Design a protein with these regions (language model features):
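Short, small-residue-biased leader/transition segments that mark boundaries at the very start
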Residues: 1-3
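Extracytoplasmic
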Residues: 8, 36-37, 47-49, 68, ...
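Acidic, polar ligand-binding/catalytic clefts
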Residues: 11-46, 129
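Pocket-lining segment of extracytoplasmic ligand-binding domains
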Residues: 18-20, 28-29, 58, 95-193
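Short, flexible turn/loop "capping" segments at secondary-structure junctions
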Residues: 44-45, 63-65, 177-182
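Bilobed "Venus flytrap"/periplasmic-binding protein-like clamshell domains
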Residues: 47-115, 213, 230, 234-239
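Ligand-binding clefts/hinges and TM-proximal coupling segments of bilobed small-molecule sensing domains
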Residues: 69-86, 160-232
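An extracytoplasmic/periplasmic, membrane-proximal ligand-sensing/linker region
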Residues: 108, 115, 125-143, 150-156, ...
Length: 250
């Protein structure tokens, strides 16, 4: 809805992840046969990170080990569930038949893990996730890892994803970084938004990044210039490009 409304001018600004934006501009995936390509990027805001948690007592170390088991994959058609589909498919499995999928949000999903109803919960968003933090605070829980072959296949097949890690100490009992993948969440604009307006919006945000991060630490990546102007799967708005060049970021 956000991308469709941004593209057709119903709204001038919107928020979306880079993977969904790529599908929109290329008329693929959920946007197949639709014309939703009139969007431009203003700036990335934060990253959504793939993460999954299980109880240490499960004996499971890798997401690949959950095949055939009961797994909470997020609400149906949510970002978490779409990424669960992608991950199991990249493993060569037939999703959702390869697991006993439970379509639960992060709170309910983590409760299901806590109660032994699901062996793991999959999430896709910033970290720490509240439900997963609660799970690690109340149970001896661990983050699941990727087998390197699976992770590298995901990165090779989907250029908008990037390798990253969840730092040690993010969750209670997590004593080492956990390698995973993520995607940038973008502020997008209707392609017909005036260059002047786009320029002024980007200028206002970029010149007040420190204040934004002080109010919400999840936005800390915005302080990294390379993160802000790094390669994106959709074009920057010309007004944004003008500001970034004037500021010496491009």
């Amino acid at each position: 809805m956000c991308i469709r409304d941004s593209s057709d001018g119903t709204v001038e600004l919107g928020l979306c992840t880079a993977d969904v934006a790529t599908q929109a501009v290329n008329s693929t995936g959920k946007f197949e046969g639709q014309n939703c390509n009139n969007i431009k990027a203003l700036f990335p805001i934060y990253s959504s990170i793939w993460q999954a948690m299980t109880l240490k007592s499960s004996g499971i170390e890798y997401i690949e080990d959950t095949v055939g088991q009961s797994v909470s994959v997020g609400m149906a058609a949510s970002a978490a569930e779409l990424c669960a589909n992608l991950v199991y498919t990249e493993m060569g499995e037939q999703y959702p038949d390869c697991i006993k999928a439970q379509y639960l949000g992060v709170g309910e999903g983590c409760d299901a893990v806590k109660d032994g109803i699901a062996v793991a919960h999959i999430s896709f968003g910033g970290y720490p996730q509240g439900g997963m933090l609660d799970l690690s605070n109340t149970k001896d829980a661990v983050l699941l890892k990727f087998q390197n072959a699976t992770l590298q296949k995901i990165l090779a097949d989907y250029s908008y994803y990037f390798e990253t890690s969840i730092p040690a100490g993010t969750y209670t009992g997590q004593d080492a970084d956990v390698t995973t993948y993520g995607v940038k969440c973008l502020c997008i604009a209707n392609g017909d938004l005036s260059d002047e307006m786009a320029y002024n919006i980007v200028k206002a945000v970029m010149e007040n990044r420190e204040d934004l991060v002080a109010g919400n630490s999840a936005l800390k990546e915005m302080l990294n210039d390379d993160y802000v102007v790094g390669e994106l799967p959709i074009e920057f708005h010309p007004g944004a490009v003008k500001y970034y060049k004037e500021a010496g970021l491009m």
